[in-house]
């Protein structure tokens, strides 16, 4: 009986995955589970040489802290699952 109870507890812990696993987009429609310790999703945008033709470059990912920005970059951070979709996904 004790063995059965212990087995149920272990299975429950494994199934629940007690660690807080954040899911962020790492690319267009590409959600991934972040590594342990990375509790933020981010969206970074900037213009490159093709900005007028293609629009801003967009980088999506996971981070432990919100990335620092350079003067020409825009960075947005959030802490909920899938809170950083590609801007093209939001408009659908």
UniProtKB/Swiss-Prot annotation:
Q: Which InterPro entries match?
A: Snake_3FTx, Snake_toxin-like_sf, Snake_toxin_con_site, Toxin_cobra-type
Cite the record's tissue specificity text. Expressed by the venom gland.
Does the record's keyword annotation contain Signal?
yes
Q: Which GO terms describe its cellular component?
A: extracellular region
Q: Which of UniProt's keywords are assigned here? A: Acetylcholine receptor inhibiting toxin, Disulfide bond, Ion channel impairing toxin, Neurotoxin, Postsynaptic neurotoxin, Secreted, Signal, Toxin
A single GO molecular function, which one?
acetylcholine receptor inhibitor activity
Annotated localization: Secreted
Where is it predominantly found? secreted
- Signal recorded as keyword: yes
Q: Which residues form the signal peptide?
A: 1-21
Task: Output the PROSITE patterns linked to this UniProt entry.
Answer: SNAKE_TOXIN
What disulfide bonds does the UniProt entry report for this chain? 24-41, 34-62, 47-51, 66-77, 78-83
What functional role does this protein have? Binds with high affinity to muscular (alpha-1/CHRNA1) and neuronal (alpha-7/CHRNA7) nicotinic acetylcholine receptor (nAChR) and inhibits acetylcholine from binding to the receptor, thereby impairing neuromuscular and neuronal transmission.
Which family does the UniProt entry place this protein in?
Answer: Belongs to the three-finger toxin family. Long-chain subfamily. Type II alpha-neurotoxin sub-subfamily.
Q: What is this protein called?
A: Long neurotoxin 469
Give the lineage.
Eukaryota, Metazoa, Chordata, Craniata, Vertebrata
